[in-house]
């Protein structure tokens, strides 16, 4: 199932097959992804290509310094003598949060809180986000102008973070020849419910659980100031299950 998706995405995003697989594994595990790279490196194109090939609804939010929380979450308006809630772009399966660290801390916080809770609270009313729901966020390096760094407590909400690979000469030639015609490479939509059933059946041995705890203990021994959260440990296991499914296996190795 995923071989075709990976093949299609690789037609427009060359030289990043491992990151494509890692992103799909995170999405299967209902985790969110943070891509950090320089402007013009293809972050947005990469994220769009992933979403188009999953057959899920998605919307893009361009973060800027003047973006308000209500521009993301939604707001109430008075219509026909009553308040009606107008949903923001966060009400979709996949949100592409473009240049997240260009937004104000207030907008970042509101967005990431909704991402964590998978719901939006406005004027005392709570609105659930669609299922499945996850975020593919991009950000520019901290030394780029107009950026504000995300605190560790917010970075912890992302399952994985990476930069895109540098292309070799052959890959650059292929990119220049083929361009970024994303609309022509869409795959068949995946069955999300079947996928979640399959994920629950993935076997994880006690040795794998012990190995994850060993990773935590090693990190702590190297730097006592680094805290490995329980959420992080769980996400490692979930990501491993997603990685197994991407590779057509029903067990974690």
Where are these regions (language model features)?
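Canonical AAA+ ATPase core
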Residues: 79-82, 99-107, 115-189, 194-201, ...
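Walker B catalytic acidic pair
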Residues: 37, 98-99, 110
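P-loop (Walker A) phosphate-binding loop of NTP-binding proteins
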Residues: 38, 72, 138
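Pre-Walker A (pre-P-loop) alpha-helix and adjacent loop at the N terminus of AAA/AAA+ ATPase modules
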Residues: 1-41
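Short beta-strand-centered segment that lines the nucleotide-binding/catalytic pocket of NTP-utilizing
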Residues: 57-69, 124-128
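Conserved alpha-helical scaffold flanking the Walker A/P-loop in AAA+ ATPase domains
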Residues: 21-25, 76-96, 100
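Basic, amphipathic alpha-helical bundle interface domains used for macromolecular binding and assembly
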Residues: 179-253
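Walker A/P-loop
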Residues: 24-64
């Amino acid at each position: 199932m995923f071989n075709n998706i990976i093949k299609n995405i690789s037609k427009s995003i060359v030289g990043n097959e491992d990151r494509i697989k890692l992103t799909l594994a995170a999405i299967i595990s209902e985790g969110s992804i943070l891509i950090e790279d320089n402007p013009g490196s293809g972050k947005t194109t990469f994220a769009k290509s992933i979403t188009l090939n999953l057959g899920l609804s998605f919307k893009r939010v361009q973060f800027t310094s003047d973006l308000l929380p209500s521009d993301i979450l939604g707001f109430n308006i008075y219509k026909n003598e009553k308040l009606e809630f107008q949903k923001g772009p966060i009400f979709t399966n996949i949100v592409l949060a473009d240049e997240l660290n260009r937004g104000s801390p207030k907008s970042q916080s509101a967005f990431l809180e909704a991402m964590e809770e998978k719901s939006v609270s406005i004027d005392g009313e709570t609105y659930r986000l669609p299922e499945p729901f996850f975020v593919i966020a991009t950000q520019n390096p901290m030394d780029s102008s107009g950026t504000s760094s995300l605190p560790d407590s917010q970075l912890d909400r992302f399952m994985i973070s990476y930069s895109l690979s540098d292309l070799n000469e052959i890959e650059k030639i292929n990119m220049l020849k083929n361009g970024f015609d994303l609309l022509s490479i869409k795959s068949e939509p995946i069955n999300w419910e079947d996928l979640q059933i399959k994920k629950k059946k993935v076997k994880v041995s006690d040795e794998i659980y012990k190995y994850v705890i060993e990773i935590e203990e090693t990190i702590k021994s190297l730097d006592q100031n680094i805290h490995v959260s329980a959420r992080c440990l769980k996400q490692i296991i979930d990501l491993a299950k997603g990685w197994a499914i991407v590779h057509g296996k029903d067990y974690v190795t």
